[in-house]
């Protein structure tokens, strides 16, 4: 992330200069946008730069997060200790968002809540953006349904592993063989066919486009899913 004063904040992923491709060049000016899983806020701030009226949301606490099951995993062996370790990390992530929020003079609203509770919220948005989070959800199907229920116009699931299968398939996104933290939060690759079915059920048509991001200095390409509403709310 490059801040307004020219200073840079580094991280493993870099999509600077690629945001428009990342969201499939979807127009955002004048639209209300919900950024789900905002993390450091990069997508929210980029959407604001393009004239969107943004609300950002993320996990309230680590209790909202799930880990792959392993006997040696602290998440399963001692959940209280796992929460005590993870909540400070989540606070650091939130602090980085608020630092950027002040530096960019952002006007984005923020809500911290589990994804499945967003449907209790009496708000709808023109566009819902979920950037590279679906593979990190143990229940991506319900989450996609939530995104769709909140979107008046479009859902954009950015830079996300997609199985090429046209059947109604959930494939594991990794071998599920390592309890190491960097691997234990990656769950599923939803198939093209299953994306189409879920969104059709919710009144959307689906397009898959390719986009690029830099991971630890190496370019990587993945699909972005653009679902456009064809059945009005």
Feature locations, PLM:
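Conserved alpha-helix/loop element of class I SAM-dependent methyltransferases that forms part
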Residues: 10-30
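Conserved class I S-adenosyl-L-methionine
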Residues: 31-39, 156-179
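Class I SAM-dependent methyltransferase SAM/SAH-binding core
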Residues: 42-45, 49-112, 117
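Short alpha-helix
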Residues: 93-100, 186-203
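A short acidic, Gly/Pro-enriched loop at the edge of an enzyme's catalytic core
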Residues: 119-128
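A short SAM/SAH-binding and catalytic strip from SAM-dependent methyltransferases
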Residues: 127-138
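A short glycine-rich, Lys/Arg-flanked "PGG" loop and its adjoining helix->strand segment in the class I
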Residues: 141-154
